[in-house]
Swiss-Prot record:
Entries under Pfam families matching the protein: Ribosomal_S15
Source organism (scientific name): Cucumis sativus
InterPro entries referenced in this protein's UniProt entry, alphabetically: Ribosomal_uS15, Ribosomal_uS15_bac-type, uS15_NS1_RNA-bd_sf
Biological process, per Gene Ontology: translation
Domain of life: Eukaryota
SMART domains hit by this protein: Ribosomal_S15
The gene coding this protein: rps15
Record family assignment: Belongs to the universal ribosomal protein uS15 family.
Record's protein name: Small ribosomal subunit protein uS15c
Organism taxonomic ancestry: Eukaryota, Viridiplantae, Streptophyta, Embryophyta, Tracheophyta
Single Gene Ontology MF annotation: structural constituent of ribosome
UniProt cross-references to PANTHER family, sorted A to Z: RIBOSOMAL PROTEIN S15, BACTERIAL AND ORGANELLAR, SMALL RIBOSOMAL SUBUNIT PROTEIN US15M
Biased composition, class Polar residues, residue ranges: 1-11
Gene Ontology terms: cellular component: chloroplast; ribonucleoprotein complex; ribosome
């Protein structure tokens, strides 16, 4: 399994202090999404994992929506650093 190096996005000190921050949660959800996506490429009929992936995608989308309403600059930086698409509804 290939590990994604998103530690550059949030430093180790910030992880300890702000484990519940929106950015940290989005990064951890993105790691889970990428891991589940690679799993589902091998196991196409794993419907339980597909359901879990959809739930995590929804959670990440809600957090990104919240962040875009509260602080647009932090939202744009996070989107660019994680290389994920911006939502069409924003």
């Amino acid at each position: 399994m290939v590990k994604n190096s998103f530690s550059s996005v949030i430093s180790q000190e910030e992880k300890k202090e702000n484990g519940g921050s929106v950015e940290f949660q989005v990064v951890s959800f993105t790691n889970k999404i990428r891991r589940l996506t690679s799993h589902l490429e091998l196991h196409k009929k794993d419907y339980l994992s597909q359901r879990g992936l959809r739930k995590i995608l929804g959670k990440r989308q809600r957090l990104l929506s919240y962040l875009s309403k509260k602080n647009k600059m932090r939202y744009k930086e996070l989107i660019n650093q994680l290389d994920i698409r911006e939502s069409k509804t924003q």
